Each structure stands twice: as structure tokens, then as C-alpha cells.
């Protein structure tokens, strides 16, 4: 490494056993029972929930519609970053935590009202889900609803490894890389259509 002009910083370098795991770029890599799993790091989850709490507390007086729009952008961005790792349980935990944060927001906003009144005002039933945080939105004469995004509804997509022998410069693998690119574009377009 020294030939290339690279040095390891002792403060930033940590050598650890894979069974203990390590955090890197918001992910935690660790072996569980002989199988390597990459999950969102606990520090990243805590930081995200603290950010959501701070956002909700600072937006006490805003319209519900604006709060939902703001939270949806944050939730979707965070979830898209972690959608390629083992994150389903984390997404469920986030949804549960955000539910209680938003519930407290509604209760704090209407301190003289009961829980059932707050539920009727801010929550609706959608299919089998009985507690969907929502707001009515008026656009001209039409009225629609905006719902809080649930992290658990995001599809986990695993990274497909490139074949070891495949090279984009080898004409024999031209069709293979065209097919990979098509699949990548299809997934990208599918995620936009909701």
C-alpha cells in the first residue's frame, strides 16, 4: 500500500472478527450462525428516528397534509438506501416507531380531546389496515387523500452479482450485459409507477 501512497489511519482503522461484525456507511456486516448478513446499523436507525422525532416536534402547528408530504420524502429516501440489504424487520420497527411518534403528535395537538376523537380525525381504514395516518387534500372541487408512507411496503431487492467470467468487452457476453441492463431499467421504471 505504501508503494501506492496509501496509509491506514490508526484512529479510523478497526480490525475485528466477522462474528462480532462492523459498521460501514450505515450498514452492519456480521455473521449470524455462519451466514453473513448485512443490515442497517443500529446507530443509523437511531439517528433516523431522532431526525423524524425532531421534525414532527418542530412541525406542531403545520397542516397534516404538509407533515405527511415532508415525512414521506424522508421515509422513502431512507428506505431506498437500505432496500438492498436484510432490512424487512428494521422497516417494520421503523413503521411502528413512526406510528407512535405521529400518534403523540396528534394527541399533543388536541390535548382536550380523547384518543378515539384523535383516531377519527387523523386515521382511516384502508383494506386490512385500520390505522392509516392520512389527510384530506382538496384540489379544486375534487377531494382526495394523502397517506403516510410505510417502510414495510418497500420491496427488498437483492443485488445480482455479475458472473465471474463475464466481461463487458468480450463479444460473447454482449447479450448477457444487454439483458442485465434491460432488467435494471425495468426495475427502475417499475419502482416509479405507484
Where does each model-flagged region fall?
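Non-catalytic terminal/accessory segments
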Residues: 1-194
